[in-house]
Amino acid sequence: MKRKLISAVALIMCAIMFLFCGCKSKKNGDDTTAPSESGTAVDAVTDESTEPSSEETTEPEKKEPASDAVRRVTDISRNPGHVNTTTPSVRKSEWKKDGKYTCGKNLAAGEYYVVPNSKKCSLMLTDGKDGELEFEILPCGLFVTMKAGYTLEVKNGKFILASEVNKMGATNGKYKLGSYRVGVDIPAGITTLGSSEGSFFTVFSSSDYFDEDATAIMFAEDYPVYYNLEKGQRVLFMEDTSLGVKIPGANSDGSYNSGMYKVGKDIKPGKYTLVPTDSENGYMVYYDLRYIELSIKDYKENVKAGTVITLADGTYFRSSGLKLVPYVEPGTTAAPETTT
């Protein structure tokens, strides 16, 4: 279940990539090292007050093509631990039966919602050229955009126009395994997402997985994360997930475990000492939640014991294999007071 930040050199499609470049996931028993999009090491993005890391680093993962992200989801779905066959309520029950459909021939263009009827539901999508995506087992409902020439083949399932699907809300505060629309099923805005198991979901800018301009970002962490959900996005929860999850507070000794924190809200601004709890570790500091290269203020892997960092109000701190301890000036016994 642990994720570790490590340097990566493997090819991009040879392993599962997650939000951190070189993030190792054991969410599904996978212990594969993930590569960066470029496969090359680069300097950290810093401002004038932040010194570049002296350690070898790999560029943190940014948003990626939606097609790459959904292919990783299809890999995960080959042996899902759970399949959600729930049929949502719809305005008009005009479900299309399983079969093969070609957009422009026996299927109109538009966005559809595909639902498995059993644990043996499979889905194949192609762009009519050389692009294809296959879910050997479709683990839950999925939004899919069809354009002229695209084909859709579903077995042991059904589908309907997405516009006919009523709001799919949370049950007892949790969104079940499935695909949801931001602005319809999920409110837009900055929030924390996760569960008692952590966070395991993907945010897509579009449900057209063959659109070269569509992007996606996958999270697979042992803790809740912050994200700015925007209207029109599609979110695929790979486990039951809640919004507005409480970020864990400080330990009894005042330290903070690995996780994601907003400085000025979850932790105070000021100096902190980093204490490694794992030999493979790392941290990132974000200016904002766009999760692009310009969002990154600082990051470092394989942090040495005693490393001191200064966290500014309004930034986001995220770590793996590290404890965050309020800094104590040499010769004193108590951490200095900081203000929120």
Where are these regions (language model features)?
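Bacterial N-terminal signal peptides that target proteins for export
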Residues: 1-9
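N-terminal, intrinsically disordered, polar/charged segments of Gram-positive cell-envelope systems
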Residues: 26-98
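A glycine-anchored, Pro-Gly-centered beta-turn/N-cap motif
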Residues: 97-99, 108-111, 178-190, 259, ...
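Beta-sandwich interaction modules
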Residues: 100-103, 130-146, 179-182, 215-229, ...
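Short, surface-exposed beta-strand/strand-loop-strand elements in extracellular ectodomains
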Residues: 118-130, 197-209, 279-292
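Noncatalytic modules at the cell exterior or secretory-pathway interfaces
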Residues: 144-156, 226-238, 309-322
